[in-house]
Amino acid sequence: MPRLCVCMLVLVLALATFSEASWKPRSQLQDASSGPRTNGALEQHQLEKLGPASHHRRQLGPQGPQHFIADLSKKQRPPMEEEEEAYGWMDFGRRSAEEEDQYN
């Protein structure tokens, strides 16, 4: 029985932690749908309404889809030298096999 209580407590705490990021009061939902705004103005308005409890989130900055795309584009870079060397070795093996066929 105590083990079940501990498991339930851990489950409730985990759900509360994960749901905190997606929870919004109704007033914020109504404000967002009440009128058209630019993305910058909307983000600034939301940051002002968040208050002191979200100090760490404000330090992280906006986390919209456009920021994820920018992060992904940073990760796409030219192949590393090690990969190029590996391709050279594979090519060397292929050329060696072709040369052996020519001599036989």
Curated annotation (Swiss-Prot):
Location in or out of the cell: Secreted
Bias kind Polar residues: ranges: 25-37
Query: Which residues does the annotated region (Disordered) include?
Result: 23-104
Q: How is it modified after translation?
A: Sulfation on Tyr-87 enhances proteolytic processing, and blocks peptide degradation. Levels of sulfation differ between proteolytically-cleaved gastrins and between tissues.
InterPro entries, per the entry:
GAST, Gastrin/CCK, Gastrin/cholecystokinin_CS
Q: What is its main location?
A: secreted
Q: Where are the transmembrane segments?
A: none
Residues making up the signal peptide according to the UniProt record: 1-21
Give the sites modified to Phosphoserine. Answer: S96
What PROSITE patterns does the entry give?
Answer: GASTRIN
Annotated GO biological process: G protein-coupled receptor signaling pathway; response to food
Q: Which GO terms describe its molecular function?
A: hormone activity
Residues found modified as Sulfotyrosine:
Y87, Y103
Phenylalanine amide occurs at F92
Q: What cellular component terms from Gene Ontology apply here?
A: extracellular space
**Proregion residues excised on maturation:** 22-58, 96-104
Q: Which UniProt keywords apply?
A: Amidation, Cleavage on pair of basic residues, Hormone, Phosphoprotein, Secreted, Signal, Sulfation
Concerning its family, UniProt says: Belongs to the gastrin/cholecystokinin family.
Function of the molecule: Gastrin stimulates the stomach mucosa to produce and secrete hydrochloric acid and the pancreas to secrete its digestive enzymes. It also stimulates smooth muscle contraction and increases blood circulation and water secretion in the stomach and intestine.
PANTHER family assigned to the protein according to its UniProt record, in alphabetical order: GASTRIN (PTHR19309:SF0)
What is the protein name stated in its UniProt record? Gastrin
Organismal lineage: Eukaryota, Metazoa, Chordata, Craniata, Vertebrata
